[in-house]
Structure formats: structure tokens, C-alpha cells
Amino acid sequence: MKKTLCLLLAALLVLSLAACGKQPATPTPDPTPDPAPNEAPKLVEALIPAEEYPDIVWENAGGGPCWNENYIVTVGNDSSNSKTIFYSTNRQTGETRSTELDGLWISDSLALYGDSFYWLTIEANKETGERELLLLKYDCATLEKTTVFTEPCEYWAENSQLAIDDEWAIYVLTLSDSEYEIRGYSFADEKNHTLMKLESSIFPRLVQMTDGCYSVALQESDGWAARIIRLADDETVWENRSESTRVPTRLAFNESWIVLREESQADPNAGSLRVWNRTTGEELNVDGLKGMLYPSSELYLIGDWLYSTRLVTNEDGSQRQALIRIHLPGDQAELIYDGDVFRFRVDPMTGEIAVWQTYDEPSQNHSTTHKLILLKAS
């Protein structure tokens, strides 16, 4: 018994001495923290491969594009006869069909829903000569045309927008330099309804969301204010009034974020970016993003990513616009398309980006030439 006890004590002594001589485990260092929101994130390359549907080079590229999982619909100009052409491309087969436009082209008046695309236009009545506003529906596969509605047009609608869902065709009409009317054509009662009127020196933008259609209005009738308005019930769901020296110029939003760009009236290039968390209502400090984006570029959101462009210097000293995205609240920035971006548009529904890239070889008549490229956002 004593012998067994001695052996146990000896074993414990050995273990104790070993423990005393053992070096303490090196603690695992914490991962490098993300930069604070007021520090500029480093721009890293995360280039997206391009899918070119359709592979068409346009001179004076027109409106659109509109696209979904099955089709891409675009508008381009045929310089040989000064005609405007619709292009409808089947994304599964790559087949492209085209048809010449009837009526007057109105900027941004093209919308795609299901297997049909809709076009808002103005043309003269063949019998009376009076101007009429028409909403036309085209089958994407056959390009068969149907007139949805026709009504007298006593105003000039140089710019418009069009949003389509199961119940409504919603569009914006320009009544004067600062007066706009948002109307909705109900597919149920087959009538047009005035949804709201507003005064603004900046054209209001329609935003199609999963829960309905919204208007982004940047108004100045009673001082500069940026508003997000739900058209179904004419409710202002968010509003921000700017200082008298600041002008709101771009506004993007989704379920999580609101991003507003303001410009200085004294210096349009001295813009600032403001970001709000929609869940908490808190405005974030994003001073580090100042100067990262091209001042007049569009803003789009997909999830927590903000898409815009920035100026990049070429080897010869010239500059081009490259497409970038910033992870909100401003902790990461990625260069995702390094071409010379003329315009771009993001579709949150499909998570894709349409880019108009300035074409390398100018056309013979020296008009601006662009190529449409469709990119995956993820």
C-alpha cells in the first residue's frame, strides 16, 4: 500500500514539474479589424467576367436595357436611316429579333415584365393630327404589338419612366420644367389614375421593389428635400432636408440602406455621401468615402453593396470611369469592371449590372459609340 502511494506521489510530482516547465500557449491574435467608417477602404480588384448579350455595337446607344432571366430588351439607333430599333434577345438561345419603332422615343420609357416589354410613346393621330400618348405592349419572342391605351397628350413628355407589375403600369409625365405627374394605368379597370403631382427641378425616379413601386423625389419647392414615396398609398416613408448650400442629386435605397449624394452649390465637384441604416435609422460616418466616387455617377444598391463609378487614370494621363462597389457601412471597396464605363444600370431583382462601355474605335460619322455588356454582380 505504501509502495503504491509512493508511486502515485512520484507521478504527481513529475506531472507538476512538467506543467511548471511548460510554456504558456501563444494566444491567437484577433483578426485585423476593419477600417473605421471614417477611414478610406483600400480599393482591391475583384473583376467580374463579362457576358455580352447581345453582342451589338451601337452609335448613340438608346434607352434601356431592360432584362430578366429570359430576355434582354434594348434600344439602339440605326445611323444608316436615322431609325430607332428595338432589339429583343432570348438569353437561353442567344437569338436576337429587332423591329423599327413607331412613334416618338421618350427617354427611359421601356419596361420588361414576364415575356413582354412595354413602351410609352407619343405620336400624332393619323386622322386628326393631334398628339396622343400610347402605351404599347410587345411580345418578346414574336414582337407582336398590342395597344394597351391611347389618350390625348397636351404636354411634352421628353423624359418619362415606366414600371410594370401585375396590377399597374406606372409612369412619369413631364408637365413643365419643374412639374411632374405620376400616373398609373390599372389593368383591372383599364383606366389611368393620377397617383401624385410634385414640383422638383430634378426628374423623379421610379424604383420597382418587391413590395411595390416607389418614387424617389428630390424637391425644392419648399427647400431642398430628398423623399422616398410609396405610390400605393402616397406615403412618404423617408425624408431628409438638406442645408441651404447643399443640393441632393442622387438617392438609392433598399430594405437595409439609404444612400444620398449631396453637392455643393458653390462647387459641384465637392460632393458628399451620406448613408443611413434603415433598420436603426442611424446615419453613419462615411467621411472616408469622400472623393472615392465620380461626382455625377448613378448610385445603385444590391444587398449591402453600393455600386457607382470612379475616375481611374490611364497610362497616357487621360481618365476613364471604372465600375466599383463599396460594402456598407464602408469597410471594403472593390474595382469590379475596369472598362471605360459610359453609363450603367443595376437590376436588384436579378442581381445583374448592365454597362454601356465606350467603344475603342469611333464610327465614321464621329458619333459616340457604345457597347452593352451584362455583368453578374456576384
Residue ranges, per PLM feature:
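N-terminal "mature head" segments of proteins
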Residues: 20-127, 145-155, 370-375
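Repeated scaffold domains used in trafficking and secretory/extracellular systems
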Residues: 57-69, 104-114, 154-166, 199-210, ...
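Short loop/turn segments that connect beta-strands within beta-propeller blades
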Residues: 90-94, 138-143, 185-190, 230-234, ...
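Structural motif
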Residues: 80-87, 125-136, 177-184, 221-228, ...
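C-terminal motif of bacterial Sec signal peptides marking the signal peptidase cleavage site
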Residues: 15-19
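Blade-level signature of beta-propeller repeat domains, shared across WD40, Kelch, NHL, RCC1
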Residues: 340-378
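Residue position within the beta-strands of beta-propeller blades
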Residues: 72-75, 118-121, 170-173, 214-218, ...
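A short beta-strand motif characteristic of beta-propeller blades
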Residues: 47-58, 95-101, 144-152, 191-198, ...
